[in-house]
């Protein structure tokens, strides 16, 4: 298979890809064309069909399609211009080639996250974590889910990978700043994005659900936690409120989707850890995506509002 991350300007392509997005648009001259995003497990590529008259069969979003075309460059990014297209036939594709997945071991990451669960000393917080991570159905969804539609960790296992990274950062914060309530912070880190299992649909769609659009993962996760707490006898009300506050405030600012700003030091630490891992992974993914471009500098990145490049390695000549 010719994977998307292997495509370069000037390449001719005849391959099956997943049509993740399909929109009808018009040129300035009023001519109708299709603007699409095609996907495989290595990434996505902006795709256009300029001529809809010949060789273009009917297809829908989320169909697997065989395309013939050539790769060009538009504003510094690869673009696939399609000449011919038809829906892929049974046996022409394997779904595992089209679902992006973490490069790390899913089982290995979950085992490491479980060790943090097992080291929580507070009996109420431990019961809460066991209520989630002792549920086989929840665990299966949690391990397979992404952490985002596109920006960071938007791949199978991404939610687990992001959660583990945030938890490890919070564990470091607890060593560096002993004032932190470790059990509260670690529990908050492990649970901070659990709402995403219902905010985003399963692969291959990996798109926002109706409830995800209307409510969002922060509130959804808080509601999930509240439901579990109600089934734990004697769970202290103050501790419950502190935990829920950490979840509600973990995006840090109202404009970033948090209904509350951090009022506890643990909520502040969780916000920093979440933001750090999200931005680091976003930069890593941006460098990987831009690696297809020639030249040391990779161009302007909208998310970081800066021209970016990879760091030079020791021993390289200037």
Region roles according to the model:
Residues 271, 288, 295-318:
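N-terminal intrinsically disordered, cationic/polar leader segments
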Residues 35-40:
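Short, acidic/hydrophobic/Gly-rich beta-strand patch recurrent on exposed beta strands
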Residues 22-32, 45-48, 52-97:
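OB-fold single-stranded nucleic acid-binding module
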Residues 150-152, 161, 172-291:
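Divalent metal-dependent catalytic cores for phosphoryl transfer on phosphate-bearing substrates
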Residues 92-214:
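Acidic/His-rich, divalent-metal-binding segments that scaffold phosphate/diphosphate chemistry
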Residues 11-27:
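Structural detector for short beta-strands of small beta-barrel domains
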Residues 1-13:
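OB-fold nucleic-acid-binding modules
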Residues 17, 62, 166, 247, ...:
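Divalent metal-coordination and catalytic microenvironments
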């Amino acid at each position: 298979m010719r994977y998307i991350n292997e495509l370069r300007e000037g390449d001719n392509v005849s391959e099956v890809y997943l049509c993740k997005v399909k929109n009808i648009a018009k040129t300035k001259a009023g001519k109708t064309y299709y603007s699409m995003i095609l996907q495989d497990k290595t990434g996505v590529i902006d795709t256009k069909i300029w001529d809809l008259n010949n060789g273009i069969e009917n297809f829908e979003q989320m169909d697997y399609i065989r395309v013939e075309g050539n790769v060009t460059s538009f504003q510094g990014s690869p673009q696939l211009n399609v000449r011919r297209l038809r829906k892929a036939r049974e046996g022409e594709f394997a779904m595992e080639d089209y679902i992006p997945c973490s490069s790390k071991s899913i089982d290995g990451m979950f085992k490491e996250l479980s060790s943090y669960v097992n080291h929580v000393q507070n009996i109420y917080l431990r019961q809460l974590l066991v209520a989630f991570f002792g549920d086989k159905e929840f665990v299966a969804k949690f391990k397979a889910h992404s952490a985002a539609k596109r920006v960071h960790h938007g791949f199978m296992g991404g939610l687990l990978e992001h959660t583990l990274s945030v938890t490890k950062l919070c564990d470091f914060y607890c060593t560096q700043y002993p004032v932190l309530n470790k059990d509260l912070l670690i529990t908050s880190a492990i649970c901070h994005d659990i709402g995403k299992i219902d905010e985003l649909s399963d692969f291959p769609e990996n798109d926002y659900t109706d409830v995800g659009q209307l409510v969002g993962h922060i509130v959804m996760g808080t509601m999930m936690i509240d439901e579990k707490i109600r089934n734990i006898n004697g769970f202290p009300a103050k501790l419950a409120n502190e935990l829920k506050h950490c979840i509600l405030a973990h995006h840090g600012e109202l404009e970033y989707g948090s209904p509350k700003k951090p009022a506890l030091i643990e909520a502040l630490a969780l916000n920093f850890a979440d933001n750090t891992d999200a931005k680091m992974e976003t930069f890593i993914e941006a460098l990987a995506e831009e690696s297809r471009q020639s030249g040391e500098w990779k161009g302007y990145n909208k998310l970081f509002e800066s021209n970016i490049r990879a760091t030079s390695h020791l021993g390289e000549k200037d």
